[in-house]
Amino acid sequence: MLLPVAAAAAPEGACDGVTVGAADTAAYFPLLRGRRVAVLANQTSRVGDEHLVDLLHRSGVRLTAIFSPEHGFRGTADAGEHVASSVDERTGVPIRSLYDGRTRRPSDEAMRSFDVLLVDMQDVGLRFYTYYISMLRMMDACADFGRAVVVLDRPNPNGSYIDGPVLDMKYKSGVGALPIPVVHGPVSYTHLRAHETG
C-alpha cells in the first residue's frame, strides 16, 4: 500500500513558500498510530529546524528502524563510499545501511522489524541521483513483505526543467533504474514509481 503525502504551497503570509510532506503531520500521524515505524531518511529529512527522526521520537511514534541511503543517515560519507549500519545516538534507533557494499536491499530481519515505512529524502531531479533508487528498492521489499509505504514528498528544486535522453533499460544500474530523462524535472517520487509499474 502506497500513501503519498504531497508537498504544497505554504499558506499566504508564510515565509518559506513551501510546506514539505513531512510537515503535514495531521495527514500521516494517524497512519502511524499503534504501528512499528521505519524511515528511509538522510540529512535532508528536515521539518523546519528539526530532523524527521527527532520529530517522530519526540512525538512518541514507535520508531523501530532507520534505513540510510548513499552518503549515510547524516550525509557525511563520500559518493560511493560504503557505510556501516549503526545506532542513532540521539534516539537509540538502529540505522540499517542500504549502502554497505554487501547488499542494497534490506535483510528479512530488518523488514520484519516494522509495519509501515516513511520515505523522506530530497531529490534533485537527476536520473543518476541514487536516493530514488534506494526508495524503489525499499518499496519493492515492502511489497514483498506486505508493508505499507508513506512517501513524504518534497518539491523538486529543478522545477519543470526536463533534459537529456531517456534511459535505455538495457543499461539499468545502481545509477539509473527507470526509463526517465537525465533531468526529470517535476516528476515526484510517487510519479516515478507509478511510471515504473505502469
Enumerate the predicted regions with their spans.
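Glycine-rich oxoanion-binding loops at beta->alpha junctions
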Residues: 84-113
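Acidic, His- and aromatic-enriched active-site or binding-groove loops in soluble protein domains
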Residues: 169-188
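N-terminal phosphate-binding or glycine-rich loops at protein starts, especially the Walker A/P-loop
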Residues: 18-61
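A short helix->loop->beta-strand "cap" motif at the edges of active sites that frequently abuts
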Residues: 61, 145-148
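Glycine/threonine-rich flexible loop motifs
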Residues: 123-133
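Short internal beta-strands
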Residues: 64-70
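Glycine-rich, charge-decorated loop segments at or immediately adjacent to ligand/cofactor-binding or catalytic sites
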Residues: 75-79, 150-172
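Single conserved hydrophobic/aromatic residue that forms the stacking wall/gate
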Residues: 191-194, 198
